[in-house]
């Protein structure tokens, strides 16, 4: 999920000059906004922008990282994803962070602001890059574990690049799905093959709740479709790994056949943030090929209670300190049983957006004020998240790496972590432990 609408809008507006320093008054986009209140707020926040631009961090592993987009089946029933992977050393350029202006229009719609705001955001943020080599050749000669990644509500495939790139730099292939369930702020497909051949995109935007809709019902339908999209993406990647000829509709420079015999088929996991965290649980309950799952600040509302007892695989909850609430934590607790591996940690001083790239593309002051940043340094937060994830993945995918050096993070043993949750559930029967043997004091 994205942050509260006004918070996100104000934060992005206030950071425009950080990305593209020009005379804002010369551009004068607020002249096109009818509401004087909006104009005044935007101008005031622009004046408050800090002078230093933040950047999305590079991966900390030993592998160079490549990036490409894959679309299989040109219709909106097909699979669309951004792939991060270990790459060969070459001179390919970095990857555009948000590659089409329509994604900014989708964000504008999600935020409930005029479409002009999408044009403004596109103008200033459209050239921001993320540190992965676009269409760089895959590093061959070994098989890689595979991660399927699910984005949050109002997000899309490209805005968790700090996680995808770091995992790829440690030797994973990461398939970041763009969901077609109506939860992405924007996505595109092609109406027919001829449209695909000439690149004539058809765009669809966030599905808004209609009057009379029950959110639980709508979100449950979406999370079921999302889980199927995760399995569908896995099917396609494994087909390519087997050597089945599958054409990338986008017809990019990246040769899909490079992926043949590149996947360690016994080492597959699913990770997701917020709505994507709920998708992790749904996917685990439906597809046993996912050996384990990591839910980042999961939003549990979309899930039926019935699935909690249908997840035998190891599951790791990594939460922020400021997003979670008792009802959400109680639902996580329903996944726990003595015979199942369950872990939970909370990153101290963190907010919901510490898991997404927005926390890196805004200045410190404004990012903090509008909850894109927490009290903890954004780089420290994502580093803890990624290292704890790597340790968990090594343990449950049987990897022969050195990620076990971070095993203590899984238990919340760091000055910036706490085991369990910071949420105080007063009924002792609702107390959530970090593991079946953990002491209750780990919760508080």
Swiss-Prot record:
InterPro entries: AB_hydrolase_fold, PAF_acetylhydro_eukaryote. N-glycosylated. It is an enzyme of class 3 (hydrolase). It catalyses: a 1-O-alkyl-2-acetyl-sn-glycero-3-phosphocholine + H2O = a 1-O-alkyl-sn-glycero-3-phosphocholine + acetate + H(+); 1-O-decyl-2-acetyl-sn-glycero-3-phosphocholine + H2O = 1-O-decyl-sn-glycero-3-phosphocholine + acetate + H(+); 1-O-dodecyl-2-acetyl-sn-glycero-3-phosphocholine + H2O = 1-O-dodecyl-sn-glycero-3-phosphocholine + acetate + H(+); 1-O-tetradecyl-2-acetyl-sn-glycero-3-phosphocholine + H2O = 1-O-tetradecyl-sn-glycero-3-phosphocholine + acetate + H(+). Its EC number is 3.1.1.47. It is found in: Secreted, Extracellular space. Gene3D superfamilies: alpha/beta hydrolase (3.40.50.1820). Its main location: secreted. Plasma. The active site is at residues 274, 297, 352. Residues 1-21 form the signal peptide. Belongs to the AB hydrolase superfamily. Lipase family. PANTHER family: PLATELET-ACTIVATING FACTOR ACETYLHYDROLASE. This is Platelet-activating factor acetylhydrolase.
């Amino acid at each position: 999920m994205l942050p509260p609408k006004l918070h996100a809008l104000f934060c992005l507006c206030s950071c425009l000059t950080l990305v593209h320093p020009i005379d804002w008054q010369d551009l004068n986009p607020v002249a096109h906004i009818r509401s004087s209140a909006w104009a005044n707020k935007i101008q005031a926040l622009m004046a408050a922008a800090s002078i230093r631009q933040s950047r999305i961090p590079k991966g900390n592993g030993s592998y160079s990282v490549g990036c490409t987009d894959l679309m299989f089946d040109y219709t909106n029933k097909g699979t669309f994803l951004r792939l991060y992977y270990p790459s060969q050393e070459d001179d390919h350029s970095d990857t555009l962070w948000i590659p089409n202006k329509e994604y900014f229009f989708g964000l504008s719609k999600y935020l409930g602001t005029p479409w002009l705001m999408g044009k403004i955001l596109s103008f200033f943020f459209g050239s921001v890059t993320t540190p992965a080599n676009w269409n760089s050749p895959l590093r061959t000669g070994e098989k890689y574990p595979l991660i399927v990644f699910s984005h949050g509500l109002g997000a899309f495939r490209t805005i968790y690049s700090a996680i995808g790139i770091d995992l790829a730099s440690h030797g994973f292939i990461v398939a970041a799905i763009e969901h077609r369930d109506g939860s992405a702020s924007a996505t595109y497909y092609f109406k027919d093959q001829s449209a695909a051949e000439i690149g004539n995109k058809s765009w669809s935007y966030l599905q808004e709740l209609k009057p009379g809709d029950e959110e639980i019902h709508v979100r449950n339908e979406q999370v079921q479709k999302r889980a199927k999209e995760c399995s569908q993406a896995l099917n396609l990647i494994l087909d390519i790994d087997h050597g089945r000829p599958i054409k990338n509709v986008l017809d990019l420079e990246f040769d899909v056949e490079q992926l043949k015999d590149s996947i360690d088929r016994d080492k597959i996991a699913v990770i997701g943030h917020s709505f994507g965290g709920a998708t992790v649980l749904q996917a685990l309950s439906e597809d046993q090929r996912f050996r384990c799952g990591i839910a980042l600040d999961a939003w549990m509302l979309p899930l039926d209670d019935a699935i909690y007892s249908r997840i035998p695989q190891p599951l790791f909850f990594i939460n922020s300190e400021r997003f979670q609430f008792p009802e959400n934590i109680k639902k996580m607790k329903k996944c726990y049983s003595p015979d199942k591996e369950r872990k939970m940690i909370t990153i101290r001083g963190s907010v919901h957006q510490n898991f997404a790239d927005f926390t890196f593309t805004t200045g410190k002051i404004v990012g903090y004020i509008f909850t894109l940043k927490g009290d903890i340094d954004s780089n420290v937060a994502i580093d803890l998240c990624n290292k704890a994830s790597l340790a968990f993945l090594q343990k449950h995918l049987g990897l022969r790496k050195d990620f076990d050096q971070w095993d203590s993070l899984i238990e919340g043993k760091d000055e910036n972590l706490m085991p369990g949750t910071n949420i105080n559930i007063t009924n002792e029967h609702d107390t959530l432990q970090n593991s079946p043997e953990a002491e209750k004091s780990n919760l508080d």
